[in-house]
Amino acid sequence: MHTIFETIEKVALKIDHAIKTEDLGYSESENSSGEDQLKLDVKSDYLIEEAFKSVSLVKDLISEEKEGVMPLHSNGKYTICYDPLDGSSLADVNLSVGSIFGIYDGEPKGENLVASAYVVYGPRIEIIRAVKGERPKHYRAQDGFFNLVSKEVILKEKGKLNAPGGTQQNWCDYHKSFVDDLFAEGYRLRYSGGMVPDLHQILLKGGGIFSYPGTSDKPHGKLRQLFEVIPFAFIYEQAGGQAIDAKGKRLMELVPAHPHDTSPCFFGSNYEIKALKKAYGVNA
C-alpha cells in the first residue's frame, strides 16, 4: 500500500503543475457520462495511468473519465477507481479542485475497499489518506515532498458547516426543510461546487454535513459510487463520522452494477446524520 500512496503523491505534484501551467479550455471529447471533457481532465487521467503502469500491485484501473476497465498487471492485487480531476470546471475561476482514489481488493464494491485517498489542489497541495482500522492522515506538500500534518483526523460529534449540493428547485420538500432547519440552527453555508474541497473543509473544520440528494432531474443522484462516493464514505467513517444514502443505508454497503452508477449521498458528523435520518423518515 505504501507504493500506491507514494505513487499518488508523485502524480499529484504533476497534476498540480498541469493545473498551474496548461490550457484550461475544453477538449473535443466527452467522458463516459456524456460530459464535455476539459483538457485538464484528459491530461490528469493520462498522468495517473502512466504513473500506475509501473506499479505491479495494481491489477486494473477504472477511471471516471473512461467507460471500461484498463488492465495493468494480471498478477496484481488491487483495482484502483479514481476521479482524476474532480471539480475541474472550477479551475478556470481559480478555485480548489481535487483527485479521488478508491483502492479495492477484489470486485470493486464498498465492502472490498481497503484504502482511499484524495488530493486537494489549492493554495497548497494536501492529501488525506485512510486505511482500515486507522484514523485518516493529513499530509501537505512542501518542496516536492509530503509532510505529515496530522496522524489522526477526527470529526466532532456535531459540526457547524452545511454544504448542500444539487439544484435547489429540484429538491424534494423534506430535503429542503432539513437544509433550512440546519441554517435555522446557525449552520454556515460552505459550498463551492467541488466535492473534494467541500468535504475537505468539513473534515478539517471538525464537522458538519455534505449532502447531494436525489433530485427531480437526477433521482439517483449525480455523484459516482466507485470514484467519489465510496472512497469518501470510507474516509468519513474512519474519521468517526457517517456516510449514508437516502434510505439510511451505509454507502460502504453499495454494490455498483456498473462502474459509473451514481447514488444520493450524505457525509457528516453523527449529529447531522441523525437529523437527516429523522427528516427522511428512516430508522436511526
Curated annotation (Swiss-Prot):
Single Gene Ontology BP annotation: gluconeogenesis
UniProt EC number: 3.1.3.11
Cofactor note: Binds 2 magnesium ions per subunit.
GO MF term list: fructose 1,6-bisphosphate 1-phosphatase activity; magnesium ion binding
Record: residues binding Mg(2+) 2: 83, 86, 228
Catalytic activity entry: beta-D-fructose 1,6-bisphosphate + H2O = beta-D-fructose 6-phosphate + phosphate
Residues the entry annotates as binding substrate: 86-89, 191, 222
Binding positions for Mg(2+) 1 per the UniProt entry: 64, 83, 85
Enzyme class of the recorded protein, top EC level: hydrolase
Gene Ontology cellular component annotations, sorted alphabetically: cytosol
Membrane-spanning parts: none
Pathway(s) per entry: Carbohydrate biosynthesis; gluconeogenesis
Swiss-Prot/TrEMBL cofactor(s): Mg(2+)
InterPro entries associated with the record: FBPase_C_dom (IPR044015), FBPase_class-1 (IPR000146), FBPase_N (IPR033391), FBPtase (IPR028343), SBPase (IPR023079)
Keyword terms, alphabetized: Carbohydrate metabolism, Cytoplasm, Hydrolase, Magnesium, Metal-binding
PANTHER family linked to this entry: FRUCTOSE-1,6-BISPHOSPHATASE-RELATED, SEDOHEPTULOSE-1,7-BISPHOSPHATASE, CHLOROPLASTIC
Family per record: Belongs to the FBPase class 1 family.
Subunit-level organization: Homotetramer.
Name under which the protein is recorded: Fructose-1,6-bisphosphatase class 1
Organism, scientific name: Sulfurovum sp. (strain NBC37-1)
Gene: fbp
